[in-house]
């Protein structure tokens, strides 16, 4: 066997650590395999207390402090980092309105619509393509930007009072202009409009 082949398959703790460090201590089975860690080796690290199993296919280096958005990070990693936090979840991340989402809203690419997925408990899926220009980052996870978030919430049936409050806050902060809020205006038209 070639020495180069051995070097490629040897576990690389630094690589795994660097990957996890960029994701608040979390990593996936695939990311571990890319760093040379088999599931058997992960089990040994779990037994040794260096790694914890979070959910199917997702692990955490135990010496990282727990953060405030762990359920969001694990939902994003579950999507193989293809998803974007959206709707009420993104609204909450942006600090708009008073919504306390009971679900993690995650938008997956449109071509994932027909995939049969084992969706984690507490995650609500949406399907649409979200370009990079319409994303904001909150630590290690992406969420839809303010304009896209308000549009998604307007089309997704957020209560008129919450939608109006969030849109007014975004306008006051200068995060959006009135021209960015066509979907919000349309959703609020039967309820007196944005100024109602």
Predicted feature descriptions by range:
Residues 1-85, 111-120, 128-132, 138, ...:
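Short beta-edge/loop segments at beta->alpha junctions of small alpha/beta modules
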Residues 2-3, 88-196:
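Phosphate-handling catalytic interfaces
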């Amino acid at each position: 066997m070639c020495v180069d082949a051995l070097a490629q398959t040897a576990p690389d703790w630094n690589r795994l650590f660097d990957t996890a460090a960029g994701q608040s201590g979390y990593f996936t089975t695939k990311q571990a395999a890319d760093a040379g860690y088999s599931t058997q080796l992960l089990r040994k690290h779990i037994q040794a207390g260096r790694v914890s199993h979070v959910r199917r296919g997702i692990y955490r280096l135990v010496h990282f402090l727990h953060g405030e958005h762990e359920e969001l990070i694990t939902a994003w990693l579950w999507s193989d980092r293809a998803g974007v936090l959206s709707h009420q979840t993104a609204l909450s991340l942006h600090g708009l309105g008073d919504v306390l989402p009971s679900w993690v809203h995650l938008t997956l690419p449109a071509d994932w619509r027909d995939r049969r997925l084992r969706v984690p408990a507490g995650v609500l899926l949406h399907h649409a393509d979200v370009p990079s220009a319409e994303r904001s980052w909150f630590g290690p996870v992406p969420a839809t930007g303010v304009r896209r978030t308000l549009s998604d919430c307007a089309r997704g049936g957020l209560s008129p009072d919450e939608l109006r409050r969030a849109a007014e806050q975004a306008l006051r902060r200068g995060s959006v202009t009135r021209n960015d809020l066509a979907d919000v205006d349309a959703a609020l038209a039967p309820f007196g409009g944005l100024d109602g």
